[in-house]
């Protein structure tokens, strides 16, 4: 899907790691939510509450999921992060991403 229709977009950005990761939240008519953002090169550790499906549009990064080894991803690609977990990122080039939050079957 190249574009989203009939959505509400948060005006304010979520800014993490001194601006190295930024995103904007979008909400769909069915209540589901995604974020659209970028990650600049660096190393980061993030937490999840809900399962996240990370859709990498472009860029190169390595991901360390719980109880796994580092895996390299080159966009376009997708990977899943389990709910209630911490994961690490090594971002090697600007990453353009869309994150889908899976909760309550949505």
Residue ranges of each PLM-predicted region?
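A short, N-terminal "cap"/entry segment at the start of jelly-roll beta-barrel domains
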Residues: 1-31
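Compact, glycine-rich, soluble single-domain proteins
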Residues: 22, 26, 35-46, 64-65
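Residue-level recognition of conserved beta-strand positions in structured domain cores
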Residues: 38, 48, 65, 91, ...
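Short, conserved beta-strand element in jelly-roll/cupin
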Residues: 48-63
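Short acidic-glycine-tyrosine-enriched beta hairpin
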Residues: 66-87
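Ligand-binding loop in jelly-roll beta-barrel domains
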Residues: 82-106
């Amino acid at each position: 899907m190249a574009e989203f229709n009939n959505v509400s977009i948060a005006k304010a950005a979520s800014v993490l790691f001194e601006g190295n990761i930024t995103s904007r939240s979008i909400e769909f008519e069915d209540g589901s939510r995604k974020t659209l953002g970028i990650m600049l090169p660096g190393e980061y550790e993030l937490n999840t509450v809900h399962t996240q499906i990370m859709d990498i549009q472009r860029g190169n990064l390595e991901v360390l999921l719980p109880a796994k080894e580092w895996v390299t991803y080159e966009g376009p690609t997708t990977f899943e992060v389990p709910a209630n977990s911490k994961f690490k990122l090594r971002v090697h080039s600007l990453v353009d991403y869309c994150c889908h939050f899976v909760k309550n079957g949505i």
